[in-house]
A protein has these predicted regions:
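Carbohydrate-active catalytic/glycan-binding domains of CAZyme proteins
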Residues: 1-211
Length: 211
């Protein structure tokens, strides 16, 4: 992105960074895209919003569109998916969404940044929202990121990472790889990877999901 935090609109040659404009203003960042085949609005964009760098007043929201260009065609605001507050005792931070569909067909919503680690919960692929959250209650939605989901891992101090999770499955190795960033936004910033040959449902049903 540019100096202003913006969401790249599209790029024919992403490796060469030939961006063709932006699709949102400075309030949205860390997007992830999920394609729901057969849906009226099949392109689901999960976007992060925070009240300042390093804060925990954060939300991940969902916008559904008919075109991958997002603002190029019709779109629908699906609202807040999950939210966190600055003064929460669990040091959670609801940004950096990642959507991953496992080999058993279950789809997961993965999030978390910088503070108390990376979290995971099952996604309802009919709505694009997270299973287990009462979306009929504004109060519940606004505190949904506090002590919700399963924490996969974090640093011992609870700060300086991990953040920015991104998960892929390699059918040749049979492993799921989760890439995350650690450290402060400086020379010690580094990228790490964790892997597992178990499905996430197997991990979440175990006694120690951190392994």
């Amino acid at each position: 992105y540019t100096k202003k935090v913006t969401v790249p609109k599209k790029s024919k040659e992403f490796i060469d960074k030939n961006y063709s404009g932006t699709t949102a203003n400075t309030t949205y960042w860390a997007p992830d895209l999920y394609y729901k085949e057969g849906d009226e609005y099949p392109y689901w964009f999960y976007l992060s919003t925070s009240c300042g760098l390093g804060g925990r007043n954060s939300v991940i929201s969902l916008i559904k569109a008919k075109s991958p260009g997002l603002w190029d065609g019709e779109y629908a605001d699906a609202g807040v998916v999950i939210a966190s507050k600055e003064n929460n005792n669990y040091n959670t931070n609801c940004i950096d969404a990642n959507i991953f569909t496992d080999t058993d067909g279950k789809t997961y919503f993965i999030w978390g940044s910088f503070w108390k680690g990376i979290y995971m919960a099952e996604l309802d692929t009919d709505t694009g929202l997270v299973k287990g959250i009462d979306y009929t209650s504004d109060a519940t939605i606004l505190s949904s990121g506090q002590k919700f989901g399963t924490r996969l891992f974090s640093t011992p101090s609870g700060v300086l990472g991990p953040e920015g999770p991104y998960t892929v499955y390699n059918k040749d190795t049979g492993y799921r790889y989760m890439f995350t960033s650690y450290g402060w936004l400086g020379t010690n910033y580094n990228l790490r990877v964790a892997r597992t040959n178990k499905t996430f449902s197997e991990i979440l049903s175990g006694s120690n999901p951190h392994k």
